[in-house]
Regions:
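A short, well-structured juxtamembrane/interface segment
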Residues: 37-54
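Short, amphipathic alpha-helical interaction segments embedded in low-complexity terminal/linker regions
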Residues: 198-289
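Charged, alpha-helix-enriched surfaces in structured cytosolic catalytic cores
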Residues: 40, 44, 131, 185, ...
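Glycine-rich phosphate-binding loops that contact phosphosugars or nucleotide phosphates
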Residues: 59-190, 196-204
Length: 289
């Protein structure tokens, strides 16, 4: 569908700049709204992915071209945002045009990923027929990994190959075939939902804060201080001291301040809870020292 001509294609060259960007804005809005009928499918994928990651699985994205770049973008942000190891969310992408047509290359990439039954393979393709991605999902079938498809073509081959199909009908692009536009935007929005909701359900956030943030620069260190102060009710100075004692780990710092324990005990409580800050704080309130 993204290859079809836009209804206003013949007049695009004659539009003013304001008319052109207004048209694109309207098209983007329509594409975003097209996700709404599929939210049940997105939510189902979130629940299934969270269940597998809770069991020690990994989340693998497979895409080519724009879809691959979108996959890489989402995967790259997960460690810093949620504090997960880079291996937990991995993007397997190709960029050369000829590679998109290579089904066996997709199979090879999936084999290298060593997919297992607790893992998740997410195939991303605007057309839903990219050979590289189809090959990857075919290999995922033999490993019993969960297969999720994100496409912009309802009834696609990729959707049929998946356990859960999220097929958002975005319609023709303003420039026919330019899937970096609406299709790429929608793919990123769906991946935003999947990764953010999954890691929130896995307790890598708390009350809308990045309690897993890895403070690798000044901006993130400042954010970590705000997170600790906001969730502990402590001053900036107290939060900084707790973070230092916690080795920069916001969750440990929050437990130190909220429960009045030392860093080693705070870390142990979190480890025994599987990193669930909410559970640790609730247990601390129920059983005060």
């Amino acid at each position: 569908m993204s290859e079809n001509l836009h209804p206003r294609a013949d007049e695009l060259d004659d539009l003013t700049a304001r008319e052109f960007v207004g048209l694109m804005h309207a098209e983007d809005g329509a594409a975003v709204r097209a996700i709404a009928p599929l939210l049940d499918d997105v939510a189902r994928a979130v629940e299934e992915i969270a269940e597998r990651l809770r069991a020690g699985g990994q989340l693998h994205y497979f895409g080519a071209g724009t879809s691959g770049l979108v996959a890489r973008l989402d995967a790259a942000e997960c460690p810093a945002t949620f504090g997960v190891d880079p291996e937990v969310v991995q993007a397997h992408a190709v960029e050369e045009p000829a590679q998109e047509d290579d089904r066996e290359l997709g199979v090879e990439f999936a084999r290298r990923a060593q997919l297992a039954q607790h893992d998740v393979a997410v195939g991303i393709s605007a057309s839903g027929r990219t050979a590289f991605v189809l090959g990857a999902l075919a290999e995922a079938t033999s490993s019993r990994a969960l297969r999720v498809a994100i496409t912009c073509h309802p009834g696609s081959a990729l959707g049929r190959a998946a356990d859960i199909a999220i097929e958002v009908e975005t319609g023709p692009e303003v420039i026919a075939g330019s899937t970096r536009l609406k299709a790429g935007t929608v793919q990123k929005l769906v991946l935003n939902m999947l990764s953010t909701a999954v890691f929130t359900r896995l307790a890598h956030t708390h009350r809308g804060r990045m309690v897993g943030v890895v403070a690798g620069n000044d901006k993130l260190r400042a954010r970590a201080i705000l997170v600790v102060a906001g969730l502990s009710g402590s001053s900036r100075e107290e939060s900084m001291r707790a973070l230092e004692a916690a080795g920069g780990n916001p969750k440990i710092a929050i437990v130190i301040l909220r429960l009045g324990v030392v860093a080693e005990e705070a870390g142990g409580l979190l480890e025994r809870s599987g990193g669930d800050l909410k559970a640790v704080l609730a247990a601390g309130r129920a059983h005060p020292a």
